[in-house]
């Protein structure tokens, strides 16, 4: 596999990035008549949909209880335990045992090979007219195996299943790399796209998908002569290996700083005992939690300075890895005909160019600067002397303590009592019901359907009772589970053609056109659709095991995290396009975080809190006084550190651009000099630059330089847009549960997936009368549009508690 083409630049031609991401509900009580392939198309008995006749009220109550009561969940989840034949993982008919992964991959591989043969042999107009759809199906078949196997090999507790999933992943990934070098596919697609008699019959979606694939082929060196293509392959593999080494090899130049223990006053004495040595000194480590706590709490400024400098200075070996990575990327861009790696990476993003990103970030620095000065001036008054970078965490902590002692409401400590996981899930369902007319319905999992007994299955239904998506919620902590919250698209939405159904029926009586996973018949077109299947993973504490035990109670931060991941989910669920390559979150990298960041605003809006925030034991709603206290607390925290945190993110994005915008013939890269240059030019608390202090090299710890090379600006870009939509579409919370606002956002943004320019989505949501969109300045994007978004700013983001 190492000799095949690896393309770490952007979405590969035959797979799309998994954003780690979505959901919805109805208004009047209705009997759900679940429309699926069960009637018109053959499917195994064990994958038939369960009873959907439960009322909306019962569903709503059940939703809360399946997450809050372990006893209720055990009883609820055992209702299908007697089913004689096990269902495969996530209803996939092949995955009833570890060996099933091999079968699943081989069956999918055979279907892929048949499509490739068809495309390569195409010669008639009719054959060329189906090409975009054929290649989209090829992409779907690859993603079916790669995305699901990649998820299962990480999340499943059984090593045998992990290994089987890894082998299936490797098989299809290697085949994908073979396709990347199959020049005939590129030639045939370009021939189809150049023929007006073909493209005149294509839908807008087919045209978009064709252009995406052509661009991806171009970025995969498919058009190069053999010797250049081999060089491209070698560079891509080098970048992959260097990137992995860079991410995993972060290390400081010094492992610890030696400090006299009596100079560590302020640090937790228990921690001091842990690092204390025999000679009345302590070895303060330069990585991990202890140096962060030292910067926040040690009273001695000289100690803080020493810890700060050491913890932000990378080893020479790590800096060499980074600089080699940047050189290889620049060379790859030059080989591909681009001025720089940033030019190559940004060409299909909303930003389009490094210059536009620079305009955005520069405007953002200016819009944020006044707030930064306000925050730093307050800290400087506390210190009574010029503020240094190693002072910031310390004096922020002091201010937070002062605020907590003087003004923070004691009742805020009780807020998590109103945020049981079940009530929050109930609130999300009710919110989606009001905004989009979709809701979440707990469903009993079939035997073998989930990878752990604690995984809850939710079906998403619309107001007509139609099933539109499946969500697997793996939200509780357990040993060896990855702690980071994430959203995974296990299967994208897509229209399944009648030809596929017929092909499936001819192969095997038990075969299913969506591998047994969820499908439904579109009531308008009467075509079969594969439904989006999503996994949400979090690490919340488990509820009590007895019947009256405490449920999992969430902090405000955890509530916002769950809303964030559900924002990704709602994009997947409502962005149901006919072709999978542009469904849901399969959009430009600098647009993908918009729905999730916007969802965070809803979490603490008073009208949304009224939907769900109730005491887990008494069912008493969160009082208006407590809601006001939470808002004051958030505002206070934001005014203490929010703008400086914004500036830190902006600086990281500027460093990323500085590294990746250098021309390929620029020679060796001094990453530390560039980092220091950005810091001195844009930071309000720049790194020390005096001759007696060696320059810091924090860039060696900036692992996102690999995974988000040239696109690190995306998150703050989407934050600026989300803030704007929150104010101008949802009235800063006044219309947070308003159907008209929800429909506007759904119809202009969510439903398109990646089938519409992000700029068109934003402009459509704001409307032509919006001052920021005067003269249609946003629709076409470009430098001025990026600068306009920068002027919107990021505000201040604080978290209560």
Swiss-Prot record:
Subcellular locations according to the entry: Mitochondrion matrix
Cystine pairs: none
Catalysis performed (reactions): Release of an N-terminal octapeptide as second stage of processing of some proteins imported into the mitochondrion
Name of the protein described by the UniProt record: Mitochondrial intermediate peptidase
InterPro entries: M3A_MIP, MetalloPept_cat_dom_sf, Neurolysin/TOP_dom2, Pept_M3A_M3B, Pept_M3A_M3B_dom
Root EC class: hydrolase
Transit peptide: 1-41
Statement: the UniProt record of this protein carries the keyword Chaperone: no
Name of encoding gene: oct1
């Amino acid at each position: 596999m190492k000799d095949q083409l690896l393309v770490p630049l952007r979405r590969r031609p035959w797979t799309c990035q998994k954003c780690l991401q979505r959901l919805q509900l109805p208004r009047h009580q209705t009997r759900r008549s679940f429309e699926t392939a069960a009637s018109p198309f053959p499917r195994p008995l064990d994958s038939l949909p369960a009873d959907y006749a439960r009322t909306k009220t019962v569903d709503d109550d059940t939703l809360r209880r399946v997450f809050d009561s372990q006893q209720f969940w055990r009883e609820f989840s055992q209702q299908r335990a007697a089913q004689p034949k096990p269902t495969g993982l996530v209803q996939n008919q092949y995955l009833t045992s570890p060996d099933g992964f091999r079968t699943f991959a081989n069956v999918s591989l055979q279907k892929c090979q048949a499509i490739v043969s068809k495309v390569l042999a195409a010669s008639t107009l009719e054959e060329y007219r189906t090409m975009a759809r054929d290649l989209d199906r090829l992409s779907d078949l690859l993603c079916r195996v790669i995305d699901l196997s990649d998820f299962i090999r990480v999340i499943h507790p059984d090593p045998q299943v992990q290994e089987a999933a890894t082998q299936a992943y490797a098989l299809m990934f290697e085949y994908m790399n073979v396709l990347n070098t199959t020049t005939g596919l590129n030639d045939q697609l370009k021939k189809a796209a150049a023929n007006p008699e073909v493209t005149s019959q294509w839908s807008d979606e087919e045209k978009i998908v064709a252009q995406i694939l052509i661009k991806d082929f171009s970025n995969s060196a498919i058009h190069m002569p053999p010797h250049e293509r081999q060089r491209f392959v070698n560079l891509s593999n080098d970048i992959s290996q260097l990137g992995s080494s860079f991410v995993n090899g972060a290390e400081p130049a010094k492992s610890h700083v030696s400090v006299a223990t009596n100079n560590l006053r302020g640090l937790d004495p228990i921690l001091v005992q842990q690092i204390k040595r025999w000679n009345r000194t302590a070895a303060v480590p330069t990585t991990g939690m202890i140096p962060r706590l030292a910067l926040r709490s040690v009273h001695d400024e000289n100690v803080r300075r020493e810890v700060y400098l050491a913890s932000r200075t990378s080893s020479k070996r790590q800096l060499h890895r980074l600089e080699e990575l940047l050189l290889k990327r620049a060379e790859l861009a030059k080989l591909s005909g681009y001025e720089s790696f940033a030019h190559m990476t940004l060409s299909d993003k909303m930003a389009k160019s490094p210059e536009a990103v620079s305009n955005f970030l520069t405007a953002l620095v200016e819009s944020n600067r006044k707030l930064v000065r306000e925050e730093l001036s307050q800290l400087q008054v506390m210190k009574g002397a010029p503020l240094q970078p190693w002072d910031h965490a310390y004096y922020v902590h002091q201010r937070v303590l002062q605020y907590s002692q003087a003004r923070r409401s004691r009742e805020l400590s009780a807020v998590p009592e109103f945020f049981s996981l079940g009530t929050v899930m109930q609130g999300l369902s009710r919110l989606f019901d009001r905004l989009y007319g979709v809701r979440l319905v707990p469903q009993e999992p079939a035997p073998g359907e989930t990878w752990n007994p604690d995984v809850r299955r939710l079906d998403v239904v619309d107001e007509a009772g139609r099933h539109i998506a499946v969500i697997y919620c793996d939200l509780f902590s357990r040993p060896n589970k990855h702690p980071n919250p994430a959203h995974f698209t296990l299967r994208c939405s897509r229209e399944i053609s009648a030809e596929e159904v017929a092909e499936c029926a001819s192969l095997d009586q038990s075969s299913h056109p969506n591998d047994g996973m969820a499908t439904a018949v579109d009531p308008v077109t009467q075509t079969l659709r594969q439904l989006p299947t999503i996994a949400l993973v979090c690490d919340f504490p488990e509820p009590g095991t007895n019947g009256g035990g405490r449920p999992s109670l969430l902090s405000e931060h955890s509530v916002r995290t769950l809303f964030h991941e559900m924002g990704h989910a709602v994009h997947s669920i409502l962005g149901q396009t006919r072709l999978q390559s542009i469904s849901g979150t399969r959009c430009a990298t600098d647009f993908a975080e918009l729905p999730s960041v916007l969802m965070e605003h809803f979490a603490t809006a008073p009208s949304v809190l009224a939907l769900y925030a109730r005491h887990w034991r008494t069912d008493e709603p969160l009082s208006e006084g407590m809601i006001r206290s939470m808002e004051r607390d958030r505002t206070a925290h934001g005014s203490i550190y929010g703008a400086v945190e914004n500036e830190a993110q902006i600086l990281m994005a500027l460093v990323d651009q500085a590294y990746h915008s250098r021309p390929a013939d620029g020679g060796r890269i001094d990453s530390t000099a560039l980092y220091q240059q950005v810091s001195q030019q844009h930071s309000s608390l720049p790194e020390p630059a005096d001759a007696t202090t060696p320059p810091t090299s924090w860039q060696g710890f900036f692992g996102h330089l690999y995974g988000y090379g040239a696109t690190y600006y995306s998150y703050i870009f989407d934050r600026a847009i989300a803030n704007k939509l929150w104010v101008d579409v949802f009235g800063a919370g006044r219309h947070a549960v308003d159907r008209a606002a929800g429909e506007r956002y759904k119809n202009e943004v969510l439903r398109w997936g990646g089938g519409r320019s992000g700029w068109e989505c934003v402009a459509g949501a704001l409307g032509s009368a919006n001052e920021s969109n005067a003269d249609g300045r946003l629709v076409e994007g470009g430098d001025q549009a990026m600068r306009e978004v920068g002027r919107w700013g990021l505000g201040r983001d604080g978290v209560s508690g």
